[in-house]
Each structure stands twice: as structure tokens, then as C-alpha cells.
Amino acid sequence: MRRYMVTYAWQLLKKELGLYQFATDIIVMIRVCKMFRQGLRGFREYQIIESAHWKHPIFSFWDKKIQSRVTFDTMDFIAEEGHFPPKAIQIMQKKPSWRTEDEIQTVCNILQVLDSYRNYAEPLQLLLAKVMRFERFGRRRVIIKKGQKGNSFYFIYLGTVAITNDEDGSSAFLDPHPKLLQKGSCFGETDIQHASLRRSTIVCMEETEFLVVDREDFFANKLDQEVQKDAQYRFEFFRKMDLFASWSDEKLWQLVNMSKIERFSYGQLISKDFGESSFIMFISKGSCEVLRLLDLGASPSYHRWVWQHLELIDDRPLKTHLREYSPMERFKEFQIKSYPLQDFSSLKLLHLKKAWGLQGTSFSRKIGTSGDTLPKMLGPKIQSRPVQSIKCAMINTKFGELPKEAAVGAYMKVHTVEQGEILGLHQAFLPEGECDTRPLILMSLGNELIRIRKEIFYELIDNDDEMIKKLLKLNIAFPSDEDMCQKFLQENSWNIFRKDLLRLLVEPRQSPPFPPIRPKKKEIYNPKSVVLDLCSINKTTKPRYPIFMAPQKYLPPLRIVQAIKAPRYKIQELLPQYKSAGVLI
């Protein structure tokens, strides 16, 4: 009995202790949450006062507990996103001979974000990472002064600099469109190799971070030998070209010293408009494509194509596209035909036009009818065709109305530039009235090119009639926008027909084991597949709000499509019908 009482008492005590421990945990959690709320209150107050003190980042207040004034500098808490990593700065503070191979490789990996650094060969990248030092300068600081001897060359890791012709760089802050160099660019390489005088002034437009290579380290670590290998490669490339067959080696080396190699990966943008570029590009390896962003809404062919296909919006069979009369319409038609000497079809159409006006015709267009204009009085045999209306927002173009959703653009390949070809000289010697001023995009397919400034190249070919005759033969006539639009529509029709045929002939796959509970509503434009579906233009769907939308300045001026699904006849009606094998109906 006593043993039973002891066991029972122990169980009660255990339960009470468990409840006590549970209550203790709750109290601790409440206290911790209270401490978090008190701490976050200061952050909320800082968010309120931060914008007010942005112009005066240092402020102070009187602390009653310590009986003294506390000073707070908001600039110490600004996020340093995009700045050069502190770990790499510590490495660059060492002498080049003290840096280990792992540290050099670490710096080399960090610098891969710089396009100008990535264009060098791998051995030269490692040598540059070994001798670089880090510098940070503020706004209006002159980095290079015109007329001075070049002792360093620079890579821009963060910030922007301007190129000017004055000595103090003040004109960069007065010029509305100064020449700018931004992150990833480099300057001063040519002057450091040949110990020449600076031909321009470089000034910081904002706080800028540089990676600097000094002349002493450049030659002490034999970087000049690696640079000479690249120069010899460029010389051999130019010497093999028929364009420079008549040039002497001395003159060709002048071209080599002013040129620079750049490498681009597959799909990388080389130039948004190479016609307006200040460089001439020689394709030394690989190939690239010339693209044109077409505004399809500005093409008369696209305008006709859209409205021809929208006539099939009701999805009727091939020979019964005109919709059948309803009983009420047949009765009204009978009333009109009951008067042998008069035709009231014009009054009927006028009444319909007034009704459409009340409903708002600015957001609709009639298609597939002969009632756009009032018919002439030709007797009682006139039969008014039924009118079908497209209810959607319209925009006015120079070719007429067009559905707002159908105003899209498409990228078209204009030309493929292969190895050994030249870009930037195809319109160099044409009159201004004959030049093609359309913006043309240059996209890499994995290539290497050699750049040289146009003004330098023009100085080298001055008074060289033989060279000018060769350059005149390089003129390329690109197709017009209308021709490219027609080609796009032809390719689009074939691609859609091919998909319809495959969908009809190939057996569908088995349904997935877990079908979606609620299917997604079909939208007119699908940004993932880049397809415009005009079949759904007359259907109302609730807008789906995306989680993230890019700012408008980062988006193209038009919605880009790769294909357009237009209303079309069913492919079963277009294929031949057979009673049996080999016997047509």
C-alpha cells in the first residue's frame, strides 16, 4: 500500500513539474519576443529619420542613461553591394611576390565579371591578378591628365569615368552627353607599353574603384611578352586578309597597336546598333548574327493578315463560315423582302450603326461583312449579311485599326557574319540619303573579334584609292522591314500548320498521374512561350498578376513574340477525305 502511494505521489509531482516547465518556457518566449520588439522599434525609427538625414548623414542625440551625447553616422551602415570584396583588397595590399597561387586564383575568379579582363588569355589573366593594386577615388578626381607620360593602366570595377580633351576634366560636367566608361572597361594599356603621352584626360563622374597595373610591375613580371603574343596574333590575322595585302608591315603594325581583341560567348549581345557604333569589327573566330526588331503593327502585310484570320474567329467549318440566321433574324429578313418596291436594308443598317454607337464602337470592329458602308438602292433582292463584331481594345495605325493585343514585335535574322568578314564599313562611303539608318542588333554565336576606332582607321586609309575601292565592294543591302515581315508570316503559318498536323497524327501521350486540379486560364499573350494567341482575342479572362515585373526601362519597346496562333480552319477539313484506302469521297 505504501509503495503504491509513493508511486502515485511521484506521478503527480512529475505532472506538476512538467506543467511548471511548460509555463516557464512560455514566459521565456514572451520575454524574448519583447526584447525583439524593443530592438526593432529602433530600426523602424531609423527608417523614418534616414531619408530626412540623407543630406546630413551624421547626427547626434542626448542619452539620459549615460548622460552624454551619442553620434551616429548613417554612411557606416550603407550596403556595399557591387564593391570590390574586402578579402580581395587584403590580397592586393600584399606585394606581388608575396601573393600565393591560391590568392592569385581567387582574385582572378573575382575579376571574371569584367569584360575587358576576361578578353585576355588565361596566362595573362593570372599575371595581371598577380600585379594589380586596388584604388578608390571620389567624384571629380582626375585619373589621367592629357599630355603626361603613361605609367599605369586601369580596370574599372565600380563607377563611371569620362573622357575629355581638357586638362582638368571640367568639361565632362558641362557636356550633356560626355564620353563615358563604366564597369568592365579599361584604359591606358597602349600608353604603358610604348611610354607615350596621354592623348586625353580621364575624370571620375562618381566614386569609382580601380584595379591598377603599374609600368614597373608590368615589365618586371614579363607581362609585355604575353601582350606581344596577342599583338603578333592580330598582325598575322590582318596579314592574311586580302583587304590589307598592299599594306607594308610598318603600316599594318600601326593598325595592330590601335586594335583590341574581345571575346563573346554564345547569345551575348555585342552591340544594340552596330551602325551607330564608333568601332569597326573584324571577326577573327566564330560567327555572329545581325538581328532586326520588327514592329509588326507598322507593316501593311501584317495588318491584312490579322484581319483575314480574325474573320474565322467563330471557329465554323470551312463551307459554313457565315453564321446561320436565328428565327428572329429570318422573320426580320422576311419583313424586308415583303415590300416589292422598297428596300429597307439601309434603314436597318443605319439603326444597327446607331445601336453600335451606343455600345461604344471605339472598342470593336466589324469583320466579314459588306455593311461597313450603306448599300445602294438596287431593288428588293438585296440581302444584308449578318455582322460579326470583335469586342476588344483597338489602336489606330496608318493602315487602319488594329487590336491592341496584336501590336507586337519580333526579332528577325537579317544576316550572318562569318569569320574574316568586317562590320561597320558596309555604308562608310555611301551618300547620306542612301544610308540605311535602321537600328541593327549584333548577337554573338560564340565568336572573337578585333575592334578599332573608325576615326583611327580612316586616318590610316586616307588617300589610299585601292583600299577605298575594296571597301566599296563590302556594301551589304539588307532586306526591307516589309520583306522581313512577309517572311515572318510565312514561317509562322508553316510552323503553326506543322504543329497542328503533328497534334492530329501523333497519338497523345498518357495523361499525367497527378492532373492539375484547376487548369490555368488561357491568355492572349504568354510571356513564357512567347506566343500570341489571337484565337482568344474575343474572350474575356481575368488578368493574372505576376509575382515579379521588371521595370519598364529594362523591357523592350514591344512585346516580343516568336509565333502567332491565329484563328484558322480545322486541319481535318483541309486534308483529303477518303471513303476507304485510296478512294476519295
From Swiss-Prot:
Entry keywords, A to Z: cAMP, cAMP-binding, Cytoplasm, Nucleotide-binding
Compartment list: Cytoplasm, Cytosol
SUPFAM superfamilies: cAMP-binding domain-like (SSF51206)
GO molecular function: cAMP binding
Record-linked InterPro entries: cNMP-bd_CS, cNMP-bd_dom, cNMP-bd_dom_sf, RmlC-like_jellyroll
Signal peptide: none
A cellular component term, taken from the record's GO annotations: cytosol
Residues reported in the UniProt entry to bind a nucleoside 3',5'-cyclic phosphate: 116-239
GO biological processes: spermatogenesis
Pfam family, one: cNMP_binding
Protein's job: Essential for male fertility. Plays an important role in spermatogenesis and regulates sperm motility by controlling the development of the flagellar bending of sperm.
Protein name: Cyclic nucleotide-binding domain-containing protein 2
Annotated organism of origin: Macaca fascicularis (Crab-eating macaque)
